[in-house]
């Protein structure tokens, strides 16, 4: 039996822009009641709909996440969409521990906190509740200069795998969504820190862009069809399969085919290695 999204009450993080905004646009068509959480006050203010409640919260700060939990205490949501993401690109030697922790707070710990709260405030126990977690291709294969992001997403992926089985006892479906490289500001405007930014070196993600609106519609269809995994077939998936079977080949492909090759050559020229 298909899942009926009509009139569902939903909380989504990172909903003011990008994939989150595209998902909200699709969910509004189904008369969903939405709580949109985002750290960008300007973009939040641009969202105006009677079915959307807006909450300003920076999930990089766990104190703010705690305040968020107090604001939604007692609410009975049908669906939680853990969509917010944050990335810092840098050589490990240049990234601060605080920035590394910020990555983990936004991409992992805040979502764990929301998931834990969601379990205790179920609107029902008859299979009508779902948690949708946005992981990443990089959760399956990390990329140089993106260690904080990739490792936090890998943690989130493993957490989701665990929850998918564990939450069955509460009749909660836990869905793993693996977005491709989307045509959003998250990817288009992302920059390196430190030396790599100063030298304006190409970002270490050479995958082609994919339509955000199209993927949002695919997610909605996947939810309605009770899918456990939602992803798009691409050459990246072929690479991940090869990497799974032969990790050493994955290493070679990353070194030779990604923008890391350009970065590595520049580091050598400037005597950084």
Q: What does each model-found stretch correspond to?
A:
Residues 115, 152:
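Active-site helix of classical SDR
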Residues 169-234:
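SDR active-site lid
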Residues 143-147:
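Active-site loop immediately N-terminal to the catalytic Tyr-X3-Lys motif
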Residues 83-88:
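Conserved NAD(P)H cofactor-binding loop of Rossmann-fold oxidoreductase domains
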Residues 91-92, 96-104:
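Substrate-binding pocket helix/loop in short-chain dehydrogenase/reductase
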Residues 136:
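Residue(s) in the substrate-gating loop at a strand-loop-helix junction
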Residues 16-17:
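Conserved glycine-rich cofactor-binding loop
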